[in-house]
Design a protein with these regions (language model features):
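Conserved phosphate/ATP/ADP-binding segment of small-molecule kinases
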Residues: 2-97
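Low-complexity, flexible helical/coil segments
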Residues: 1-3, 26-36, 63-65, 106-115, ...
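Conserved post-catalytic alpha-helical subdomain immediately downstream of the catalytic base
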Residues: 99-168, 173
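Short flexible/disordered coil segments
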Residues: 52-71, 90-94, 130-149, 169, ...
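Generic alpha-helical propensity signal that fires on short helical segments
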Residues: 39-47, 52, 89-94, 109-111, ...
Length: 175
């Protein structure tokens, strides 16, 4: 969904997105998007406790599929931000009546710009390449946390780089 408050008010975004949702079958939304674009409350806005509020995210994902029956799956990144540079990140994916969760990664970020876009692109990559649901969410969050460790807007990593993160037992990541 990618809500941008400088472009539209929440009220304007909700009018536009609610109309647009009839054409959506896969919904990628971040923590702000649920409420800002659809009026669905998922968490209290405290980025230091996003992962801790996973049950409200799950309820929000279910609510999207109830309000918009054409939406077959919903995915999001959840974060517990300890500082601007330090945080825990995970992905969650709802499809076919089941929730899939990635491991939680502790990340020291160089720059957060583009991490959500990286997640979305990697998620679509997993869908296109026929990954199973767990692999999709694991792959997407791995690409996203790799982007956090790269400065500027270019996430130049290979699929092999991502698989190394996915297969690593170490979830404390830094570069």
């Amino acid at each position: 969904m990618n809500y941008r408050g400088k472009m539209l008010s929440k009220e304007q975004a909700q009018v536009v997105m609610r109309d647009f949702m009839q054409y959506v079958d896969v919904c990628i939304a971040n923590d702000e998007d649920f409420e800002a674009t659809l009026g669905i409350h998922t968490f209290d806005g405290d980025l230091s406790t996003g992962i801790d509020q996973i049950d409200t995210y799950k309820e929000g994902m279910l609510e999207i599929t109830r309000q918009f029956p054409n939406v077959k799956s919903v995915t999001s990144v959840l974060r517990n931000m300890h500082t601007v540079e330090e945080g825990d990140w995970m992905g969650i994916y709802y499809v076919d009546g089941k929730f899939y969760q990635s491991p939680i990664h502790r990340v020291h970020s160089l720059e957060a710009v583009g991490a959500g876009d990286a997640y979305g692109a990697a998620f679509v990559h997993g869908l296109i390449n026929g990954f199973d649901p767990q692999k999709i969410v694991d792959f997407a969050i791995s690409v996203s946390v790799l982007k956090l460790m790269i400065q500027h807007n270019f996430n130049v990593v290979t699929q092999e780089d991502v698989f190394k993160i996915m297969n690593s037992k170490n979830t404390n990541l830094s570069r």
